[in-house]
Amino acid sequence: MSEAPKKRWYVVQAFSGFEGRVAQSLREHIKMHGMEELFGEVLVPTEEVVEMRAGQRRKSERKFFPGYVLVQMIMNDESWHLVRSVPRVMGFIGGTSDRPAPITDKEADAILNRLEKASEAPRPKTMFEAGEVVRVNDGPFADFNGTVEEVDYEKSRLKVSVSIFGRATPVELEFGQVEKLD
């Protein structure tokens, strides 16, 4: 007796900006065609990010892989055609056009772990690095430029070295109080 084929993760390319609709349409097509046994999860990996706008903390979602949808499925002709028939699907990534290759279990685990971590706490939308020059846009040091010395993502705070009267002075600021200089 042969073992049932295992569901593997495949990457489907969708029109950018339509990933959510493609995932929803795919779920509906699977149900409509009664092919639930061939499919597992359909994911658009996102993380919640926080940004400061006009002094307000705003949460939004950012896609890990814009333009891509992850589909857990058993690949055969029927499942391949079902995915390809969904509107705004451009095709599979990896392998050949008629025989797509799944991502490795290691890659799938890394993505799923990243999703799990992303659901625990929102990340800042803007990432800062030590040595980067920023402009302070709020508080007593508004309109001063400074160099990032330390970044604390847990507390969403920065230590910025601001030049005041010719002396470098370390200042603790929140992410929303500074902006990157281009």
From Swiss-Prot:
PROSITE patterns: NUSG (PS01014). The keyword Cell inner membrane does not apply. It comes from the Bacteria. Residues 131-161 form the KOW domain. Keywords: Transcription, Transcription antitermination, Transcription regulation, Transcription termination. InterPro entries: KOW, NGN, NGN-like_dom, NGN_dom_sf, NusG-like, Rib_uL2_dom2, Transcrpt_antiterm_NusG, Transcrpt_antiterm_NusG_bac_CS. GO terms for biological process: DNA-templated transcription termination; regulation of DNA-templated transcription elongation; transcription antitermination; transcription elongation-coupled chromatin remodeling. One of its GO terms (cellular component) is cytosol. Pfam families: KOW, NusG. Belongs to the NusG family. NCBIfam families: nusG (TIGR00922). Participates in transcription elongation, termination and antitermination. This is Transcription termination/antitermination protein NusG. It comes from Vibrio cholerae serotype O1 (strain ATCC 39315 / El Tor Inaba N16961). The gene is nusG.
